[in-house]
């Protein structure tokens, strides 16, 4: 990854970013199914070349108004391949082998402004126009964003936000290839997979920054996720990323902060979530499903001692039954804790952490839709305990680093 940036004294920033990604792998598989044995091996490599160019101009005007506008252009060449060979003869299996060059271009132009109207009201607005072109698919989309904050009186805050954006599939998910997970399960690529758009509206009321109640509506046309399908012509299950017609989410959320003396403080969050998933073209088992779920989350900090400085934390998470397309998801919960000692000069820290200490975050998925039946239980031991010793030398401060965008990389 190579990055070059320019920052001017008059608000102009410009730059470029080049990324080369290569992930070769070799897999051997022996399939024993219905008295038939087949040995396969395949070589694959995900090779990505991505260029990003951008320019942005920011104007700070009198009265606290800021205006910005800019352009961002991304081009990607995907030179990935996968070659299957018979494990005994070494002969190439052309039906399952692919070597493709896939090109993708994205142009994003945007403008935005922010202003504070006195001490009670502030607003931010922006509009992005995005062009996406890949493999014969060509589309323009507009994505507006509005954020407002109103404080009618001390301790009372009203927030409204409308956001919109686009999400792209991982590059490997777009390859027209098949990977064998085991003798029964297969992972199929989907070259027809489309990006999804997301539109979200939030309304929140905060009281003294300690209590909050809010509502959210989230609409995602062309939402994509991996779903299973049991093939009718042979004993196998294919797992493939597919586009829904849409996914909708209505959420009611509350938050409360609490404090017990000077040694315990925490927050608790409660969510009521109504889900609506629809896919009218999912093989021969189209679905239009609804589900109400409850999510609870809490974080707590305990000052166990001031001299010596010892702090403990306890966090908990719970989610009731939920759905994901044709899947039914079991309830899950997670309890994690930590203990931290800090030296009087603040240079030394000793931290002991325990994650999912009751091993209750394993999810069971159940498929019972149409003629499809499947139940998968996760029996992994997710418990982990870590010990950390940290020492800060002199006045060292960690430098800020820009993370490489890897969301679409990997398999």
Where are these regions (language model features)?
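C-terminal beta-barrel architecture of Gram-negative outer-membrane proteins
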Residues: 297-342, 355-358, 366-370
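C-terminal beta-signal and adjacent terminal beta-strands/loops
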Residues: 343-411
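Transmembrane beta-strands of outer-membrane beta-barrel pores
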Residues: 6, 16-22, 73-79, 127-135, ...
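Face-selective signature of the C-terminal outer-membrane beta-barrel domain
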Residues: 1-144, 151-155, 211-214, 248-272, ...
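Gram-negative outer-membrane beta-barrel transporters
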Residues: 245-319
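Residues that define the transmembrane beta-barrel architecture of outer-membrane proteins
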Residues: 47-51, 101-107, 138-142, 195-201, ...
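Outer-membrane beta-barrel translocator domains and adjoining extracellular loop/strand segments
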Residues: 1, 15-17, 23-34, 80-90, ...
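Outer-membrane beta-barrel signature, preferentially recognizing the C-terminal barrel domain
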Residues: 166-215, 219-220, 237-251, 259, ...
């Amino acid at each position: 990854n190579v990055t070059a940036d320019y920052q001017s004294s008059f608000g102009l920033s410009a730059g470029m970013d080049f990324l080369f990604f290569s992930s070769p792998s070799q897999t051997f598989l022996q399939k024993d199914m219905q008295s038939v044995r087949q040995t396969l091996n395949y070589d694959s490599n995900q090779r990505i070349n991505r260029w990003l160019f951008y320019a942005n101009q920011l104007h700070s005007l009198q009265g606290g108004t800021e205006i910005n506008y800019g352009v961002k252009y991304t081009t990607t060449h995907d030179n990935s391949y996968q070659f299957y060979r018979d494990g005994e003869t070494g002969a190439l299996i052309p039906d399952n082998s692919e070597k493709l060059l896939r090109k993708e271009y994205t142009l994003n132009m945007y403008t935005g402004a922010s202003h504070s109207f006195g001490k009670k009201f502030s607003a931010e607005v922006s509009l992005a126009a995005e062009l996406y072109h890949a493999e014969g698919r060509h589309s323009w989309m507009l994505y507006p964003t509005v954020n407002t904050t109103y404080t009618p009186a001390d301790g009372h805050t009203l927030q409204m936000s409308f956001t919109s954006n686009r999400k792209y599939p991982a590059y490997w998910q777009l390859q027209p290839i098949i990977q064998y997970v085991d003798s029964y399960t297969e992972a199929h690529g989907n070259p027809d997979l489309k990006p999804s758009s997301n539109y979200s509206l939030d309304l929140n009321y905060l009281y003294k920054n300690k209590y909050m109640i809010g509502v959210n509506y989230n609409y995602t046309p062309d939402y994509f996720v991996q779903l299973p399908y049991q093939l009718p012509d042979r004993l196998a299950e294919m797992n493939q990323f597919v586009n829904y017609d849409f996914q909708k989410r209505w959420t009611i959320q509350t938050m409360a902060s609490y404090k017990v003396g000077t040694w315990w403080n925490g927050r608790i969050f409660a969510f009521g979530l109504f889900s609506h998933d629809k896919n009218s073209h999912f093989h021969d088992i189209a679905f239009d499903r609804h589900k109400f779920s409850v999510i609870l989350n809490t974080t707590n900090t305990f000052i166990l001692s001031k001299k010596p400085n010892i702090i403990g934390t306890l966090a908990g998470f719970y989610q009731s039954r939920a759905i994901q397309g044709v899947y039914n998801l079991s309830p899950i919960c997670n309890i994690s804790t930590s203990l931290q000692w800090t030296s009087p000069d603040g240079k030394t820290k000793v931290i002991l952490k325990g994650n999912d200490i009751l091993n209750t975050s394993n999810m069971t998925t159940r498929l019972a839709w149409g003629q499809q039946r499947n139940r998968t239980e996760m029996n992994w031991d997710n418990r982990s305990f870590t010990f950390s010793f940290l020492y800060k030398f002199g006045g060292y401060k960690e430098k800020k680093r820009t993370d490489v965008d890897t969301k679409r990389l990997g398999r």
